[in-house]
Amino acid sequence: YRRRRRRGRRGRRRRGRRRRSRGRRRAHGG
């Protein structure tokens, strides 16, 4: 099970600089 949790570089981790996604603000209603 631990091996499946590894997502590699596309994982959801908050580390270092933030990347702005285009068109993702609509999900928050902004």
Curated annotation (Swiss-Prot):
Region: Disordered, residue numbers: 1-30
Subcellular location: Nucleus; Chromosome
Keyword check for DNA-binding: yes
Tissue: Testis.
GO BP annotation list: cell differentiation; chromosome condensation; spermatogenesis
GO cellular component, one term: nucleosome
Record flagged with keyword Lipid metabolism: no
Predominant localisation class: nucleus
GO MF annotation terms: DNA binding
Keywords annotated in UniProt: Chromosome, Developmental protein, Differentiation, DNA condensation, DNA-binding, Nucleosome core, Nucleus, Spermatogenesis
Function text: Protamines substitute for histones in the chromatin of sperm during the haploid phase of spermatogenesis. They compact sperm DNA into a highly condensed, stable and inactive complex.
Record's protein name: Sperm protamine P5
